[in-house]
């Protein structure tokens, strides 16, 4: 029998406000998501240490 792929996949989250600010560097987080429960792209509010505030981080491909 063939082994099935797991439902959990690893994704990378990138800050959306950081690009607009023009500051050097980038804020990224890696996390896991369940493919069956959240099929669309993940959006979380995470801390950006460069901007020193909580910002929206979206899943990148």
UniProtKB/Swiss-Prot annotation:
GO terms for cellular component: cytoplasm; ribonucleoprotein complex; ribosome. InterPro entries: Ribosomal_bL33, Ribosomal_bL33_sf, Ribosomal_zn-bd. Keywords: Ribonucleoprotein, Ribosomal protein. One of its GO terms (biological process) is translation. GO terms for molecular function: structural constituent of ribosome. PANTHER family: 50S RIBOSOMAL PROTEIN L33, CHLOROPLASTIC, LARGE RIBOSOMAL SUBUNIT PROTEIN BL33C. Belongs to the bacterial ribosomal protein bL33 family. This is Large ribosomal subunit protein bL33. It comes from Amoebophilus asiaticus (strain 5a2). The lineage of its organism: Bacteria, Pseudomonadati, Bacteroidota, Cytophagia, Cytophagales. The gene is rpmG.
């Amino acid at each position: 029998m063939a082994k099935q792929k797991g439902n959990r996949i690893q994704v990378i989250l990138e800050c959306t406000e950081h690009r607009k600010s023009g500051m050097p560097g980038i804020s990224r987080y890696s996390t896991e998501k369940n493919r069956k429960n959240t099929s669309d792209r993940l959006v979380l509010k995470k801390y950006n240490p460069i901007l020193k505030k909580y910002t929206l981080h979206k899943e990148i491909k």
